[in-house]
Amino acid sequence: VSGQEPPKAIAAAMKAADVVIVPTAQSLTHTNARIEAAKAGTRVATMPGITKEMFSRGAMTADYNEVEKLTAKVTEMLTRASRARIEKDGYVLNINISGRNGVPSPGVYREAGKCGNLPSGEAYIAPLEDGSDGEMIIDGSMVGIGKLESPLHMTISGGKLRSVTGEKSENLDILLKNEINGTVCELGIGTNEAAILNGIILEDEKVYGTVHIAFGTNTSFGGTNKAECH
């Protein structure tokens, strides 16, 4: 499951390295292992779900100087904002982001301790853990399912996922296992104009103009929720 810690030997090796490339099936981006490696000065590029084809098309082919500029602008907007509102097909989800700082993931990691996805291109923020209420439709893709043929419907109150229905929603049972796993932990906006929706969340959440939310752990980017997943 994305967000679970790697073996201690792997965590130690990450911390001792100068640069770490992480082409894994599940994401290590929001783990203590990645956080501690960054504190030690390691540059880390996480690539969960990366495929050979993704190296030659889509998000990886973007002009990353432009991605970096746009990501910085959207990050500033998130930091300045106090609330976000997602509307789709008559459903509304209100998200409290007051007092939290936006985080850029431009796919450019030149300095010691810089980390993020590759390919990348998103600005994201940790909402207040009890500050999301409403309903939303997901019509792009979902971790554990892939590219959606039909939408998912989610009901959220007090920052927690209360129900999810739709295509293969049973694959998301870990989010309903407890309130910690089901906490809305991230709001993100895609900033990569070359990214393609393909069912692999690594690239899907980077598609320019899309918005995504995540559930679970957010302690690595300004939140307070530590869960079994992200």
Regions found by a protein language model. Give the residues of each.
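Cysteine/selenocysteine-centered motifs that mediate thiol-based redox chemistry or coordinate metal-sulfur cofactors
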Residues: 181-230
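Residues in flexible loops and secondary-structure boundaries
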Residues: 103, 144-146, 169, 192-197, ...
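Composition- and surface-driven signal marking solvent-exposed, interaction-prone regions
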Residues: 148-151, 166-177, 201-202, 225-227
